[in-house]
Amino acid sequence: MGAVGNSSSLQTKQREPSKDIAWWYYQYQRDKIEDELEMTMVCHRPEGLEQLEAQTNFTKRELQVLYRGFKNECPSGVVNEETFKQIYAQFFPHGDASTYAHYLFNAFDTTQTGSVKFEDFVTALSILLRGTVHEKLRWTFNLYDINKDGYINKEEMMDIVKAIYDMMGKYTYPVLKEDTPRQHVDVFFQKMDKNKDGIVTLDEFLESCQEDDNIMRSLQLFQNVM
Amino acid sequence: MAAGVATWLPFARAAAVGWLPLAQQPLPPAPGVKASRGDEVLVVNVSGRRFETWKNTLDRYPDTLLGSSEKEFFYDADSGEYFFDRDPDMFRHVLNFYRTGRLHCPRQECIQAFDEELAFYGLVPELVGDCCLEEYRDRKKENAQRLAEDEEAEQTGDGPALPAGSSIRQRLWRAFENPHTSTAALVFYYVTGFFIAVSVIANVVETIPCRGPARRPPREQPCGDRFPLAFFCMDTACVLIFTGEYLLRLFAAPSRCRFLRSVMSLIDVVAILPYYIGLLVPKNEDVSGAFVTLRVFRVFRIFKFSRHSQGLRILGYTLKSCASELGFLLFSLTMAIIIFATVMFYAEKGTSKTNFTSIPAAFWYTIVTMTTLGYGDMVPSTIAGKIFGSICSLSGVLVIALPVPVIVSNFSRIYHQNQRADKRRAQQKVRLARIRLAKSGTTNAFLQYKQNGGLEDNGSGEEQALCVRNRSAFEQQHHHLLHCLEKTTCHEFTDELTFSEALGAVSLGGRTSRSTSVSSQPVGPSSLLSSCCPRRAKRRAIRLANSTASVSRGSMQELDTLAGLRRSPGPQSRSSLNAKPHDSLDLNCDSRDFVAAIISIPTPPANTPDESQPSSPGGGGRASSTLRNSRLGTPCLLPETVKISSL
């Protein structure tokens, strides 16, 4: 993993220290700026193409296309949450996509570092587009499990559903009512929660989804997105 | 949507997997996916410089030239690249827009050229990125302003001549606005200027004390009282002239209301009104005080000079445009004056026999001190007063110095703008003259070619003049085209002078003489013309035997010399002069429909050169070839005959 940080702090320390007030002040300012610079100048380079190809289900050409687009948009090599939100806002201009983007970001950011590197990006895409049903469902479970504790409870589901409905925006037909998300969640839980204990585990989730034909069929929809 | 977003589309679609378990209805099927060709590298060749880019990059903006199928028009199958014959340096910026999504404006290129490139590639100028947007807009505005000034200068300047049917009003107004257009206007302009000066000087002189005739004690009177009649006469004369001018302007103004409201007319009114009021008001003691005050307004006559001086106008305009700065200056000065006056008053209050009797009295001291005049009629005597006095004078300089640079820079900008406009106007005439000369060069080329017998058949190739043979392929085709046009319209090309002279001759109905100098003319086209309407020509010839003439080559030469163009007469090969009869017969323009709008011009007999001898025309058709008929009766004649045949 090549993390190249451009820190030029080494060079400044070589100056002759004088006891000027002005000089100390200048140094202080300089260091402040450099700290900021360091954060922004960190450039990330992904692993080699062959490794990525081995790890994911994409071909070399597809990886190349993906990386070119990715690098163009994020020259520093990482995506942060802000960018995620902006991207989603552009795709869903009617409503507020920031909450869902936030959850999505957390799902992509498997290492919880606050930034999504190209490997994470490509790995997730590989699962979503070329993965098995099992993998896709597990990824979705991970998305719904906001606090990553292995269980989905009603509050988490509410948050997710509300976030999705937020993306719809105000102008919908039929008109969005206050308790529509709640009803939706109830329906979901009724279906998924086998033992009616108020939480959904991974196995319950997998089982219930595999029983549902609609979901199975829909999972094949996004096969050819690339 | 921004192009970059297209990159993220697969990701967004993939992330929709997260909705699946929640979906209560089956999701719609995905749109049919075309077999995605692998991303390929396109080569764009712009004037030899090769740019290579991914196809995807160009596809980001599908509503531009490069992003749409429009670029296929430029595809060169042999080399497999897209070729554009445009500026490669500019293309760099265009391509960078596709790559980065931001359009940057090149600093050293002309903004107009940049705009044209953008228009070609289908990019809207609004796409210019924020970093370069302000500069782009500024430069564009500057350009547009300059062009507008140019156009304005062209129109208003000493512009085109008024249409013949303009009324007295329009002519008068034009004479007033542009004194340079006619001598009378110029004379009027100077006369009024002179009288303004006289009036102002008289006003000044009549207050100088002249020594009265020797009297004991010698009394000093102002000259105005000593020679009241002389001054009154001078004043009357001036006012009469001014009144006349004002009334004439009022009459000639295209929009009287607007004229009445304009500044110059107000000045005019203010200049002449006191005189009339003085006449009307009876000379009794009560009113004469006011009457004297009115005389002060006579000094406003000096503002009439602003019509005569551009500098004054610029100054006035500057002050108007700097109104806010002046206002600020005034406001800050007032504030400072009040503050300091108050302080000084209270500082000097204790002193006995002080000049600072009240705050308004201290105003005078403050103003005099702040503007660093320092008359010395009011001086502080206490120490505190002196301290505050010095602070006052120091701050005065600052407060006054602040807005002055703004005003000065405004004035300089406007002044230079004006200079530029004037210079451009002056240069415009030279430019236009040169352009006209160049244009006439090309028309002359064709005429020259005609005279050099180029219109004959290629049979006698060797006899053709070298200059005829050495024309480029383009010229050949061009001349052929002009020739075709001539044949089509049964008119011929000629030069400006011939035409204008002919026009003059027609309006004069002048004396014409017949001179058949066919021998020196390439008869080809003219015989075409004549045989085009032989019957008519003949008929006319008989009827208007005396009123026709043809422009002999000699006269043509004379005209040439007049115009300063020296055209070497091409070799006159007899063969070229013999009209090929079959040529004329081939013409299929109906003589009946044909408006034989031929103008005859008088050939000054004295200048008829030797060449123009009355030759006995070979064919019958040729007899009338020398005769041109002017159908003076037809009203549609003159406008149509832009190009007249000339023999």
Swiss-Prot record, chain B:
GO terms for cellular component: dendritic spine; neuronal cell body; postsynaptic membrane; voltage-gated potassium channel complex. It is found in: Cell membrane. Residues 1-183, 253-263, 309-323, 416-647 are cytoplasmic. Disulfide bonds: none annotated. InterPro entries: BTB/POZ_dom, Ion_trans_dom, K_chnl_volt-dep_Kv, K_chnl_volt-dep_Kv4, K_chnl_volt-dep_Kv4.1, K_chnl_volt-dep_Kv4_C, Shal-type_N, SKP1/BTB/POZ_sf. Detected in carotid body chemoreceptor cells and in frontal cortex. Zn(2+) binds at residues 104, 131-132. Residues 360-371, 372-379 dip into the membrane without crossing it. Residues 510-520 have a biased composition (Low complexity). Residues 310-323 are annotated as: S4-S5 linker. Keywords: Cell membrane, Ion channel, Ion transport, Membrane, Metal-binding, Phosphoprotein, Potassium, Potassium channel, Potassium transport, Transmembrane, Transmembrane helix, Transport, Voltage-gated channel, Zinc. GO terms for molecular function: A-type (transient outward) potassium channel activity; metal ion binding. The transmembrane segment S4 functions as a voltage-sensor and is characterized by a series of positively charged amino acids at every third position. Channel opening and closing is effected by a conformation change that affects the position and orientation of the voltage-sensor paddle formed by S3 and S4 within the membrane. A transmembrane electric field that is positive inside would push the positively charged S4 segment outwards, thereby opening the pore, while a field that is negative inside would pull the S4 segment inwards and close the pore. A-type voltage-gated potassium channel that mediates transmembrane potassium transport in excitable membranes in the brain. Mediates A-type current I(SA) in suprachiasmatic nucleus (SCN) neurons. Exhibits a low-threshold A-type current with a hyperpolarized steady-state inactivation midpoint and the recovery process was steeply voltage-dependent, with recovery being markedly faster at more negative potentials. May regulates repetitive firing rates in the suprachiasmatic nucleus (SCN) neurons and circadian rhythms in neuronal excitability and behavior. Belongs to the potassium channel family. D (Shal) (TC 1.A.1.2) subfamily. Kv4.1/KCND1 sub-subfamily. This is A-type voltage-gated potassium channel KCND1. It comes from Oryctolagus cuniculus (Rabbit). The lineage of its organism: Eukaryota, Metazoa, Chordata, Craniata, Vertebrata.
